[in-house]
Amino acid sequence: SGQVSKQEKPVYGRMFQTPFADRVRNEAGADLGIGFMAWMHPPCHRLLGWSTRPSAFGPRRNVWRLNQLVAMAEAEVIVRGEAASTDQETLALLPTLLDAELLGKQQTCLGRLVDAVVELRSGKILHYLVARSDPRLPGTSRWRLDPERLLDQQSGQVITALEELDDLPLE
């Protein structure tokens, strides 16, 4: 890989489990692995960073702070600096709402939080995207959910007063 051109840091960016099923490279173009999961501060709906898996095999994971993100291109994220090295067991302790079940007013599962639109400079989550089925399937609808509509958060699930997903706008 050659030199990657530096781009203006975007103000907003869509993040799939944050930018981050994408390929991660440093500014010199070196491959640093595939994005793995986002970590956040759920009570404030703020993205703090994400992790990458440098290799398909092995337990090692790298954790990146949001302020290390330099640019986002199609299926690629450019970072600056060194990641913190960790393992899967430690990553499991980092908080995230992504992939949590969304429970409605009747405590029934309406879908999952599968993505977020984030203001990259501050990490503020502007809204979550909810999918009823597997978000990797082509044609899967996504609904926009404002963080203010969440009533409660527990491990692996968030609760809202929604009756159904059709109460939300489609993304």
Range-by-range predicted roles:
Residues 1-171:
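Peripheral interaction segments used for macromolecular assembly
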